[in-house]
């Protein structure tokens, strides 16, 4: 039987060990080197309290954060209200479709939060939310898959196999990480095939 995580309850109970109250270090490093066009539209699904989307918005990109938890989004709106190019909305990345696809999707701790049996849905959802030729930048947890989760583990090989049919892998590397996550994260940059 599949266990469904109640994300709203997790935020209500402050049971959010993944929330480090700052953007992912690997994302900050990548943003410091990126050469994206200023008009790039960015989506951050599973954004929680909005720390990662705020990093994109502070660089001038039109950024949207999306999450299942209204509590997390309310906190994000309050904390980052001074960023006019940052919007947050509730939604299910796997089940909804955008009015207009994005140029880039960034994710950190979403793939690992999804039941492994639904990961094919995740790969399909990327095709709805991302423009052909768009970029998918992700920091994935890489550790053995266990039944207990979230987070649910994955191997680099499983991740590559999941996304390679519709995406070209441009680069992958070990990113700078939060304390306590050494050897648990791997960063990928993909380009959606046309």
PLM segments and residue spans:
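A conserved beta-strand element that flanks and buttresses the S-adenosyl-L-methionine
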Residues: 106
């Amino acid at each position: 039987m599949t266990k469904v995580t109640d994300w709203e309850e997790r935020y209500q109970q402050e049971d959010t060990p993944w929330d480090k109250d700052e953007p992912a270090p690997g994302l900050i490093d990548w943003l410091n080197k990126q050469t994206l066009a200023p008009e790039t539209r960015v989506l951050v699904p599973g954004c929680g309290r909005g720390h990662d989307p705020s990093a994109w918005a502070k660089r001038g990109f039109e950024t949207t954060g999306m999450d299942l938890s209204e509590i997390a989004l309310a906190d994000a709106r309050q904390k980052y209200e001074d960023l006019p190019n940052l919007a947050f909305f509730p939604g299910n990345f796997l089940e909804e479709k955008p009015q207009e696809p994005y140029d880039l999707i960034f994710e950190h701790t979403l793939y690992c939060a999804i039941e492994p049996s639904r990961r094919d849905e995740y790969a399909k959802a990327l095709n709805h939310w991302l423009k052909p030729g768009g970029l998918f930048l992700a920091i994935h947890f890489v550790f053995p898959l266990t039944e207990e989760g979230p987070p649910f583990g994955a191997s680099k090989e499983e991740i590559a196999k999941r996304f390679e049919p519709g995406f070209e892998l441009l680069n992958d590397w070990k990113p700078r990480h939060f304390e306590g996550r050494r050897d648990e994260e791997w960063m990928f940059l993909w380009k959606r095939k046309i």
